């Protein structure tokens, strides 16, 4: 069976990464239920960022970042029903120089547990290099190993001349376009204090040969208990459309810690049979205190 775009299990964790710049309302949710009313309240920005965009062609913005730092490490269980099928790790092991810019190296790995690998073995590796100042990517790598399926993809993003050079071709990109990993780290710099249920904001994400738009709905706030603790969380939902970046048989809901760190706490997504839950089990090396943790 050939996985879609990002791979089966890898795609579940990558759904953690789908929120970014809120610049316009999503007009068509692509979901069965009615979309949120097109009101001024629902068109407000879901978050605001302390950033400065300059008008010079070769000038990059500066984004204030108190959300993450070198050394952060997040560990998750990937559960299918009552079975823990795999483990995922997101971490920032180093700061490297890419295209002459200081960049966070961010690694993301998804592995099936040995007890589940005999059914379906997963060894997925993703890597992105995110500009320390602009929180925009300069390079993205994907190495998927799922069952007999193999895929390797690399994209170099020229954030000055707005071109993506990939293993599959060269393509124009908008300013500050994201890969699926850098998008998540960008949203963590945002302030959701003024967000209201029903607010919709957008991600602009490049993959393969296309820049995709994906609407994300702010659902509200909730107290949530997982292995890593009990947290105050922000709850969001990607508005999945047929033919879009993600394809899903059902609803996807994401919980982020409701504080300056905005670390992913849980993801629930429907599959053909049942659902997959991804839950935070460990965290370390955070940029500051995790005030959303209750106990």
List each model region and its residues.
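Bacterial N-terminal signal peptides that target proteins for export
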Residues: 1-12
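Hydrophobic h-region of N-terminal signal peptides that target proteins for export
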Residues: 15-23
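Acidic, serine/threonine-rich low-complexity disordered tracts
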Residues: 28-157, 194-295
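Hydrophobic, well-structured mid-protein blocks that either form specific transmembrane helices
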Residues: 149-191
